[in-house]
């Protein structure tokens, strides 16, 4: 089951509530915040494919606008990538269990967002 998570973030020394609703796997790793997702981090991480576990996340609101997919490594490190990039799609297809409809959308370059 999915649970709703509200995120409290610190930004430039000021605390404020961020109106971001995240979809978090109930039995998954630690909550992933919007700040954990950065452009090009998948390509800059240079992680070999066998270091990625089969967990993957797709979210609504902020992440979908960025078309971000977050992989969690065996060491617990979070790696973010864009499904629009061929390398990310190949890694996702090889190392995740993706429903057929979303797999077809990925191959067509449509990403995971509706």
Curated annotation (Swiss-Prot):
InterPro entries: Chemokine_IL8-like_dom, Interleukin_8-like_sf. It comes from the Viruses. SUPFAM superfamilies: Interleukin 8-like chemokines (SSF54117). One of its GO terms (biological process) is immune response. One of its GO terms (molecular function) is chemokine activity. GO terms for cellular component: extracellular region. Residues 1-26 form the signal peptide. Keywords: Signal. Acts as a highly selective agonist for human lymphoactin receptor XCR1. This is Protein vCCL3. It comes from Human herpesvirus 8 type P (isolate GK18).
């Amino acid at each position: 089951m999915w649970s709703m998570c509200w995120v409290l973030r610190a930004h430039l020394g000021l605390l404020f509530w961020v109106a971001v609703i995240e979809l978090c796997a109930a039995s998954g790793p630690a909550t992933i915040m919007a700040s954990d997702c950065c452009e090009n981090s998948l390509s800059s991480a240079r992680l070999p494919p066998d270091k990625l576990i089969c967990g993957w996340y797709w979210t609504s609101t902020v992440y979908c606008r960025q078309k971000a997919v977050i992989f969690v490594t065996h060491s617990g490190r979070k790696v973010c990538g864009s499904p629009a990039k061929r390398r990310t799609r190949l890694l996702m297809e090889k190392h995740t269990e993706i429903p057929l409809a979303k797999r077809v959308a990925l191959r067509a370059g449509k990403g995971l967002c509706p």
